[in-house]
Amino acid sequence: MASGAARWLVLAPVRSGALRSGPSLRKDGDVSAAWSGSGRSLVPSRSVIVTRSGAILPKPVKMSFGLLRVFSIVIPFLYVGTLISKNFAALLEEHDIFVPEDDDDDD
């Protein structure tokens, strides 16, 4: 479930057309927003901010991350992490690799 959500968050801008494969020249002479080409990075960047005539291009599409999206990712991963650490600590204690002692309060 979590990997599907992460995949959706990564691919959402690609499907919506927010990321393009480099600067392209439109029919009217405007240069579109660019993606840092050649597949090196998934982070969108904008190399051209003005048209040939000097007009400033509109703001790029902003992908908002609401609190619901953040918590829907953070809380499941925190829960899975605590389950893994709890089970690993029980495994270590079961095999006598690490057994906590209460004798540390002798100071």
UniProtKB/Swiss-Prot annotation:
Range of the transit peptide: 1-52
GO MF term (any one): protein-macromolecule adaptor activity
Its membrane topology: Single-pass membrane protein
GO cellular component: mitochondrial inner membrane; mitochondrial matrix; mitochondrion; nucleoplasm; uniplex complex
Segments on the Mitochondrial matrix side according to the record's topology features: 54-65
UniProt record, GO biological process: calcium import into the mitochondrion; cellular response to calcium ion starvation; mitochondrial calcium ion homeostasis; mitochondrial calcium ion transmembrane transport
Membrane topology, Mitochondrial intermembrane segments: 86-107
Function: Essential regulatory subunit of the mitochondrial calcium uniporter complex (uniplex), a complex that mediates calcium uptake into mitochondria. Required to bridge the calcium-sensing proteins MICU1 with the calcium-conducting subunit MCU. Acts by mediating activation of MCU and retention of MICU1 to the MCU pore, in order to ensure tight regulation of the uniplex complex and appropriate responses to intracellular calcium signaling.
Protein name, entry field: Essential MCU regulator, mitochondrial
Recorded name of the encoding gene: SMDT1
